[in-house]
């Protein structure tokens, strides 16, 4: 292939990529999925252990994607840490994906934030997540064995968490400013938080899963690792492996 043909092919490839980019929606106009009635054991367990999220720093969580696959446009990171992101009138969302890992049933819960701030900058799209480890996917015959959460650096872990951090079956998390990581991160808290409508990976539409599996909702900054959707196909098991607390 000569240089001219190569250049034309490259231009055509760029045009194809641009043509298949997802539709963007203002961050506060993304319509969350309504929480459906759980049917499978996995779905029932995800609902049983749905956590609470208290916000002491940064944005409140928002929906990341809607039924047609349209994605949040996010927010510029500049300005106040909670500027234009104190909550959507349409409601919020917590995403979940579950599977066996070693001999534990892992339930990941993930929250999307339209921007992430660091001392030196920030980026659009930010994710925080926690993994509740149980001994069975059957909601009627399982109990909490441990918990892991995305921290300032690495993961916070407890096996099991202390009772003061649990309300019934719901672990309470706080999104706070981590001095070590210089960013928003999760920690256990005694404070009550909000519970968002839950949508599990298998309850999402194909269009929504396709968007989440791409990079449209990954946070990117030149000075940090890419903040990827933690429950997408090629990332989920890697996150379980790194967060495993036993």
Curated annotation (Swiss-Prot):
UniProt entry tagged with the keyword Signal: yes
Family: Belongs to the Necrosis inducing protein (NPP1) family.
Protein name: NLP effector protein Pc118548
Lineage, broadest ranks: Eukaryota, Sar, Stramenopiles, Oomycota, Peronosporales
Motif (Hepta-peptide GHRHDWE motif): 122-128
Originating organism: Phytophthora capsici
Signal peptide: 1-19
Glycan attachment residues as annotated in the record: 141
Pfam family, one: NPP1
InterPro entries assigned to the protein according to its UniProt record, in alphabetical order: NPP1 (IPR008701)
Keyword terms: Glycoprotein, Secreted, Signal, Virulence
GO cellular component: extracellular region
Keyword Ribonucleoprotein: no
């Amino acid at each position: 292939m000569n240089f001219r043909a190569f250049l034309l092919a490259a231009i055509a490839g760029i045009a194809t990529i641009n043509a298949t980019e997802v539709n963007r929606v203002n961050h506060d106009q993304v319509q969350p999925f309504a929480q459906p009635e759980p049917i499978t054991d996995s779905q029932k367990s995800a609902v049983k252990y749905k956590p609470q999220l208290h916000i002491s720093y940064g944005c409140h969580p928002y929906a990341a994607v809607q039924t047609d696959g349209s994605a949040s446009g996010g927010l510029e990171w500049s300005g106040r840490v909670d500027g234009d992101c104190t909550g959507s009138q349409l409601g919020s969302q917590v995403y979940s994906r579950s599977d066996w890992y070693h001999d534990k049933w892992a339930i990941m819960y993930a929250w999307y934030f339209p921007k992430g701030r660091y001392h030196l900058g920030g980026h659009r799209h930010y994710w925080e997540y926690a993994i509740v480890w149980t001994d069975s996917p059957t909601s009627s015959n399982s109990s909490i064995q441990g918990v892991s959460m995305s921290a300032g650096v690495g993961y916070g872990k407890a096996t099991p968490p202390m009772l003061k951090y649990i309300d019934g079956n719901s672990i309470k998390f706080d999104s706070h400013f981590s001095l070590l990581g210089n960013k928003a991160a999760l920690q256990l808290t005694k404070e009550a938080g909000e519970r968002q409508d839950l949508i599990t990976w298998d309850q999402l539409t194909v269009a929504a899963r396709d968007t989440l599996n791409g990079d449209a909702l990954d946070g990117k900054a030149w000075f940090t690792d890419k903040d990827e959707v933690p429950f997408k196909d090629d990332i989920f098991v890697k996150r379980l492996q790194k967060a495993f607390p036993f």
